[in-house]
Amino acid sequence: MKKVNYFGTGRRKSAVARVILTNGTGKITINTRDFEKYLPLPATRLEMIQPLELTEKREAFDVSVNVNGGGLSAQAGAIRLGIARALIESVPELRAILKKAGLLTRDARCVERKKYGLKKARRAPQFSKR
């Protein structure tokens, strides 16, 4: 059987994930490491494979991911979006299912910048009345 690659890019906070789906057996590698070793927390692993579980394609594709930037939670979110986008490229009919579950929405929340005159983004220095 001919190997067919499907690509998807996901971003979350400062993490960027480039995902390649290949017809296979369900093997997932992140930065050339097994995904169980790369993501030690079960919650982040479940978040990452959510699109595959929802569409019942867990065993249909091998997933290869190159991810950098951000922490493990942000990377899991970026991978999730990348997998969802790659799944749509492979099977366009899955778009409705993924859209309804909210897996195609880029989470735009990121760290608010620090302003001058303040200690943090919104924390003002202590005020003394006298």
From Swiss-Prot:
Keywords for this protein: Ribonucleoprotein, Ribosomal protein
Coiled coil: none
Pfam families per the UniProt record, alphabetical: Ribosomal_S9
Entry keyword Ribosomal protein: yes
GO biological process: translation
Similarity comment text for this entry: Belongs to the universal ribosomal protein uS9 family.
Name of protein: Small ribosomal subunit protein uS9
Source organism: Onion yellows phytoplasma (strain OY-M)
Gene name, Swiss-Prot/TrEMBL: rpsI
